[in-house]
UniProtKB/Swiss-Prot annotation:
The keyword S-adenosyl-L-methionine does not apply. The keyword Transferase applies. This is tRNA 2-selenouridine synthase. Belongs to the SelU family. PROSITE patterns: RHODANESE_3. GO terms for biological process: tRNA wobble uridine modification. It catalyses: 5-methylaminomethyl-2-thiouridine(34) in tRNA + selenophosphate + (2E)-geranyl diphosphate + H2O + H(+) = 5-methylaminomethyl-2-selenouridine(34) in tRNA + (2E)-thiogeraniol + phosphate + diphosphate; 5-methylaminomethyl-2-thiouridine(34) in tRNA + (2E)-geranyl diphosphate = 5-methylaminomethyl-S-(2E)-geranyl-thiouridine(34) in tRNA + diphosphate; 5-methylaminomethyl-S-(2E)-geranyl-thiouridine(34) in tRNA + selenophosphate + H(+) = 5-methylaminomethyl-2-(Se-phospho)selenouridine(34) in tRNA + (2E)-thiogeraniol; 5-methylaminomethyl-2-(Se-phospho)selenouridine(34) in tRNA + H2O = 5-methylaminomethyl-2-selenouridine(34) in tRNA + phosphate. Monomer.
């Protein structure tokens, strides 16, 4: 029989399976990577029990819960937990504070012979632990910042380095006005939880430094912690420099060719290009004010023509026109301004291949 645990660090370092028995509405606001939500009480039941608790006290609320979740419904939920536990025998369960819902779930499982240890303090304690660890890691771990103009394939370099944290991957967003991906983004709490876990795993590996991409305060709608924003502005930099032609090719792959495959997985082959085209046009419209009316109209027209050719024969070459203009006239001046405001020492500067070789040599 395993004991309940308060070793939160071990849970996250080992990717321990976690069963979240909170209501779906609570889970949607914030959870942990890989956690499974099989609620003891659903949203409506939670609402009714909460009102009962406020009006009549704990015992009345418990009695109402037992009335709402009984018979076949109780057996259905118990069976779902049983199936999960058989697949994850080293797991732990938790509710919000590690209290009555966890203990009730634990007791029901014990009735059918399953030892189900819980996380002491529940979700609230785990969340507090991750917030504290995230801030400690940001303050104490040595960071290096990978910089470069749009299309330098910074994310590809990040993905190849074992001591790197892919912030855009955690945010499920490519980090620009055109960076939205099908499936949407995690909640802010989910993003922070994933970031904290990535940081403590890097700390455990004891790298010489941790590499992150030069990001603004927002990756899509995910907000970087203020402390990390400050570190990105001040820590040593590694700069990738690539020709405009090379960056146009990478941007074509990252904005058009690669995303089309993603959209096909979400919406099917038939609707993928329309969905992607609508998103690209919406992205162009979102930066209309910064582009200016005439330039926005020109780029939008080029994009529409490129999408029409692609729909007709599958050729993506015409996309290079609007991408070239977008990089040269919009993203490059913005990047040059931002880079001029960075204070960190430049550790290395070179092509993507040279930067990768530099990183791999250490």
């Amino acid at each position: 029989m395993r004991d309940d645990t308060c070793d939160y660090l071990s849970l996250f370092l080992n990717d321990t399976p976690l069963l979240d028995v909170r209501a779906p509405v609570e889970f949607a606001k914030g959870a942990f990577p890989g956690t499974t939500n099989l609620a003891l009480i659903n949203d409506e039941e939670r609402h009714r029990i909460g009102i009962c608790y406020k009006q009549h006290g704990q015992q009345a609320a418990i009695d109402l819960g037992n009335t709402l979740v009984c018979g076949e419904e109780r057996e259905r939920r118990l069976y779902a937990w049983q199936q999960w536990w058989q697949a994850n025998p080293n797991g732990y369960l938790y509710c919000f504070r590690g209290g009555l819902r966890s203990q009730t779930t634990q007791a029901w499982l014990r009735e059918i012979g399953i030892d189900a240890p819980l996380v002491t303090g529940g979700y609230k304690a785990l969340r507090r632990f991750l917030i504290d660890e995230m801030e400690a890691c940001i303050a104490n771990l040595p960071l290096e910042v990978l910089c470069g103009r749009t299309g330098c394939a910074k994310t590809r370099v990040i993905e190849q380095q074992p001591n790197a944290i892919d912030l855009e991957g955690l945010a499920h967003h490519r980090g620009s006005s055109f960076g939205r991906r099908p499936g949407g983004q995690p909640s802010q709490i989910d993003f922070e939880n994933s970031l904290s876990i990535a940081l403590i795993k890097q700390r455990a590996a004891q790298p010489v430094s941790i590499l992150v991409e030069d990001e603004s305060k927002l990756i899509g709608r995910c907000h970087l912690p203020f402390s990390l924003q400050d570190q990105i502005k001040s820590q040593p930099r590694i700069i990738i420099e690539e020709s405009l032609e090379s960056r146009v090719q990478v941007t074509l792959e990252d904005y058009v060719i690669g995303p089309l495959q993603e959209y096909a997985r979400y919406f099917g082959e038939h609707d993928a290009l329309k969905q992607l085209g609508d998103e690209l046009l919406a992205s162009m419209d979102r930066i209309r004010r910064r582009l200016g009316g005439i330039r926005h109209q020109q780029l939008r027209q080029q994009l529409q023509e490129a999408l029409a050719v692609q729909a007709n024969c599958g050729n993506t070459e015409l996309h290079r026109e609007w991408i070239h203009s977008l990089l040269a006239d919009y993203y490059d001046p913005m990047y040059d301004y931002m880079l001029s405001r960075r204070a960190g020492t430049i550790l290395f500067q070179g092509s993507r291949a040279e930067v990768s070789a530099f990183l791999n040599s250490r």
